[in-house]
Amino acid sequence: MISSIHLRKLLGLLPEAYLPFDPIIDVLPIIPVLFLLLAFVWQAAVKFR
């Protein structure tokens, strides 16, 4: 797996104006996975009708 440091060198750093948002941007790719898990929890709650 590519480490965060190598990925940053490959894609470049964020412009300085966006540096405060860096931790948020690191979490954003996880959001679609959370929606997928939410779908399973929802179906389990309604017993997979």
Swiss-Prot record:
A Pfam family it matches: PsbK
Propeptide: 1-12
GO BP annotations, alphabetical order: photosynthesis
A GO CC annotation given for this chain: photosystem II reaction center
Coiled-coil ranges from the UniProt annotation: none
Keywords, sorted A to Z: Chloroplast, Membrane, Photosynthesis, Photosystem II, Plastid, Reaction center, Thylakoid, Transmembrane, Transmembrane helix
Disulfide pattern: none
InterPro entries in the cross-refs: PSII_PsbK, PSII_PsbK_sf
Annotated localization: Plastid, Chloroplast thylakoid membrane
Membrane topology, from the record: Single-pass membrane protein
Record-annotated membrane-spanning stretches: 24-44
Assembly and interaction partners: PSII is composed of 1 copy each of membrane proteins PsbA, PsbB, PsbC, PsbD, PsbE, PsbF, PsbH, PsbI, PsbJ, PsbK, PsbL, PsbM, PsbT, PsbX, PsbY, PsbZ, Psb30/Ycf12, at least 3 peripheral proteins of the oxygen-evolving complex and a large number of cofactors. It forms dimeric complexes.
Functional description taken from the UniProt entry: One of the components of the core complex of photosystem II (PSII). PSII is a light-driven water:plastoquinone oxidoreductase that uses light energy to abstract electrons from H(2)O, generating O(2) and a proton gradient subsequently used for ATP formation. It consists of a core antenna complex that captures photons, and an electron transfer chain that converts photonic excitation into a charge separation.
Family membership noted in the UniProt record: Belongs to the PsbK family.
PANTHER family according to UniProt: PHOTOSYSTEM II REACTION CENTER PROTEIN K, PTHR35325
Name the record gives this protein: Photosystem II reaction center protein K
Organism of origin: Phacus acuminatus
Gene, per the UniProt record: psbK
